[in-house]
Amino acid sequence: MTKWFNVGKIVNTHGVRGEIRVISRTDFPEERYKVGNTLYISNEKDTDYLPVKVTSHRQHKTFDLLTFEGYNNVDEVEKFKGSLIKVPEEQLGELAEGEYYYHEIIGCSVVTEEGEALGTIKEILSPGANDVWVIKRPKGQDLLIPYIDDVVLQVNIENKLVTIHVMEGLL
């Protein structure tokens, strides 16, 4: 059985030439949305997958704008609003050591180097120079942890466990 990964959500159309506006959920939008790549649009029930070939990709504000082969006007892509864009597991490439896919990190438990449980990673933000991991704490506000070597000491994907060093002012 094929395992599918969500790489974006189609939130609207853009213009009249069949461009769609996507909120990206992929770690590598330039690679994932490269012209010629095949993506799959899934329905709400996640039971049917429509293969589409990317014919253009550009970034606009906080969105990725895509066009697909054979879909040349707004009327043809209107039906995709609200759909998810997915890729099968075999389209995920191998990563270098110390690099992880978002889906591998989200859901990991986070502990300090002293063993204190802080919470679970619920989201990854990419505001600039480095990613920021959002940790849902059992009580209180979410905690924001920069993904830098001085803070993230160890990532154990098999055990879904991340060990961090708490720098002054982080908590």
Curated annotation (Swiss-Prot):
GO molecular function, one term: ribosome binding
Function (record text): An accessory protein needed during the final step in the assembly of 30S ribosomal subunit, possibly for assembly of the head region. Essential for efficient processing of 16S rRNA. May be needed both before and after RbfA during the maturation of 16S rRNA. It has affinity for free ribosomal 30S subunits but not for 70S ribosomes.
Subcellular location: Cytoplasm
GO cellular component terms attached to this protein's record: cytoplasm; ribosome
Keyword rRNA processing: yes
Membership in a protein family: Belongs to the RimM family.
Domain called PRC barrel: residue spans: 96-170
Domain of life: Bacteria
Gene3D superfamilies found in the cross-reference section: PRC-barrel domain (2.30.30.240), RimM (2.40.30.60)
Keywords: Chaperone, Cytoplasm, Ribosome biogenesis, rRNA processing
UniProt xrefs under Pfam families: PRC (PF05239), RimM (PF01782)
Domain comment quoted from the record: The PRC barrel domain binds ribosomal protein uS19.
Main location: cytoplasm
Name of the protein this chain belongs to: Ribosome maturation factor RimM
Assembly and binders: Binds ribosomal protein uS19.
Gene coding for it: rimM
Organism: Bacillus cereus (strain G9842)
GO process annotations (BP): ribosomal small subunit biogenesis; rRNA processing
